[in-house]
Amino acid sequence: MTFKQALLLAAFCLLSITTHSATANYNVVPLPQSIMMTKGKPFVLNESTAITCTTSNELMQHNARFLAEYIADATGIKLAHTTTVPKGSGHILLTIDNKIAGKEAYRITVTQKQVTIAGSTAAGVFYGIQTLRKALPVATNNKVAAPVELPAVQIADAPLLPYRGMMLDCGRHFFPVSFVKRFIDMMALHNMNAFHWHLSEDQGWRIEIKKYPKLMEVGAWRSGTVVGHNSDVDDHQPHGGFYTQEEIKQIVEYARQRHIEVIPEIDIPGHTKALLAAYPELGCTGGPYTVSHNWGVHHDVLCVGNERVYAVLQDIIDELNQVFPSAYFNIGGDEAPSTRWQQ
């Protein structure tokens, strides 16, 4: 084979790769309640496709932006999104349909001319977007954009449970804001709507409380970590960190745009050695206390007979109410031995 022939063959192979259409697969997790394949040719998703959202609703506009980002990330196809329905065919319509029962329910209709994702609320539309997103094949070949065929279908779905949550424990191990956002993204991908954020532990205090700076200066840090349960091996590596109130607001907003409610947890009266290390007068013995290196249940807890404890907790809750809009606030309440109270 001559060099010229080899070059032509390589060009032909590249052309065949970049123009080959992939096909969407609606067998996703969680599986929609109803998937009815319909007659008709598939919708071809390509770079001439537009995303249309005619409402000015803020969350719906976020939905349109997310869909464009998801498609670009999965397929390499970059789509524009508009607020007016374009002439002709070849667009994805995001719309609110008040006839759909259930505030998180959605419908997806795919025809040759159009894809329609409808929900009774912006949240429903968002979950429809997640289903469509997961149905797309993931591009290889360095994200070379190639058309994707969406088989004609009618999908109807709604969540079985109103509360679909995941908990992230940042008390025992601190995770950066970027990780927390990635965690929220994974929740959104699986249609979850409640982020239970565990923010205090014997091993660390993770929230900025402006009235009590020692919580960040002392309670947020430990000088080492026991490696494994029932072990005496300490790595002696400092570990810690905390989230500023501005970072918390940023995360709450990030979650809201993805239709996820952030529910904070401050564990009391047990699991409070980090708090006691910062303010030992809140314990029954007066300390000194240290931020815990090891795991398990500790006998040093908040002193329920100390009126100062209730004043401090009220101050903490008052500050957190300024950054967490959720109607729910988790106070733990588990594993609080009464040993010190009885002494």
Q: Where are the language model's segments positioned?
A:
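Bacterial Sec-dependent N-terminal signal peptides
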Residues: 1-26
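Polar helix-capping/helix-linker motif
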Residues: 11-13, 306, 343
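Contiguous, structured surface segment used for ligand recognition
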Residues: 22-161
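Short acidic (Asp/Glu) and glycine-rich catalytic loops that position anionic groups and cofactors
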Residues: 47, 293-297, 343
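A general secondary-structure junction signal
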Residues: 83, 94-96, 199-201, 266-268, ...
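Feature activates predominantly on carbohydrate-active enzymes
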Residues: 101-329
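N-terminal leader/propeptide and maturation segments of large enzyme subunits in energy/redox metabolism
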Residues: 334-343
